[in-house]
Amino acid sequence: DKPHLYSAAIESLSENISDSITGPLFYYLLFDLYGAIVYRVVNTYDALFGYRTKRYEWFGKFCARFDDLLNIIPSRLTALVIILFNPKRGLEYITRYGGIKINSTYPMSAFSGVLGVGFEKIGYYKFHGKLPDKDDVFRALKLYKKVVIILLSVVILLCMVV
């Protein structure tokens, strides 16, 4: 159904800010280009091998846990930037839903709160509120752009200072 499809699209968009923007930039600032590359390799390996299959059981677990470890700070930084656009509701949703999964639900709950919509992955989690519609997807894209601009601006400023 469309509301769950829209929910999944916005959830993916919010989580990928951390995975594709904040994480690499964070590790670039700490360890230069090598940090960003290692982060992206680990994140990609988690996506490829992090699921439980007999063939990749141990390697997949290692990738998934290492990715969890590397994302502890970037996921929370991402959520903090997102809630700049509606601090009260964003913080309320992070407090309520942020800890459901170790990292991904922080930016997801921040997006959910700022946009004032609920998310649901049937059988896994449900964030309070009406499920998103098509207009909410466009609002999410606008929020995404604003968050990315802030993240890039901060990194550029830090690079100029250091």
List each language-model region with its residue ranges.
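Glycine-rich phosphate/dinucleotide-binding loop and adjoining beta-alpha-beta core of small-molecule
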Residues: 47
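Hydrophobic alpha-helical transmembrane segments
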Residues: 1-37, 42, 50-162
